[in-house]
């Protein structure tokens, strides 16, 4: 049985509006699960399918990986399936799977929704489909029964770390993504999140914290369950509910995956984790689950062992392939952490979530363990060791008042003075599986001060990018719709490349000189091709 996995992540209504060069870990993990189970498998980016629908006919089953924000892209794929009269099975997975009732109710062409992690249920589901047996015994699957009633066989499962490590993700990226050399490939190193704090609020849309504080001070295992049924983690984040406590993959499995991705053309690899500094911390509390966001301290030995093993790969050591990490929690940053990250990753970006400048609000309302002072300290240490900090902020969050926004304005000033390279400002969007899933963004009431924050962030980002004017940087080129985009080798703002017209250099590495900037993008003059 031939099975196609379609990567529709971050395609929104059918096209990308940002992060054009990102390949998430999930679809490659899923394709690996299917291939390792003995099925003939292909993985294709959304764009390769939407433009050549006839390829769908050769597959017995199609699995579409998507997020809640990708419903438009999913709808387009389902319309395509109908148009070509496709007769096989349609399975939907990824973060969007937690909306399985809506998916199955509104999309009769979907046969099954795989809820949550795929390692355990997916091979069983495919085996049942192949043999024509009833799928009722397969865990974490949603479907319509003969009467049309929507059923789920069980809640979603959290895959043990040893099973995650045993799976070999898909690495044949040249078959799956156009211009495959230009992307940042996310390699999963930690699944799940250690923040099992919860919002300490009551009387707000079903949130009724009883102030037991088990989630903050109790036994690590007991923190997984809330007497008031409040989902774990920051109120706006679905990771703890969907993917459970942090579990680390083995060093050998990570290094093997990176080595093979490089053989197949990868030039940039992100060590993917909700928090990279959770890597190996789960081993410090084993057999308990890692459900405390800040204690114990980072497992320095494991982090260095991982990074040193990766940098033993010749292409990484010679900097022909670049390695990045993304998100970290500021409460875990200390001198040892900054030293180790600087030793291996100097010159690269690193992302820190803060959300607002009000520490009390962050803790009690958001369920976030990070103080403003944590972030200031982390920024100073990381910059001192050669990292380039980015900081996340949010607006429209529930119960955020004028005081919260005033403090956020002051915090932006401080972050600017500390030399934060970029501040990323997000609008709050309620997601399924979060404490705030039934709350709407609160923007109109505070629109004036929110606009001040937007302008201040925009000004900061513009001033920061002005330092790039006149600099010559290495970029990977992507030709699209008559234009060239450049993605900096060491990460940074997308470059609109001028002075190069022939499409034959797409996928090549080039040298460009930055000559103008905007808050989100920069413009660069093409100088020469460095490698193809």
Language-model features, listed with the residues they occupy:
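Conserved SAM/AdoMet-binding glycine-rich loop
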Residues: 1-6, 91, 251, 255-389, ...
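Glycine- and acidic-residue-enriched helix-capping/strand-helix junction motifs
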Residues: 14-27, 294-303
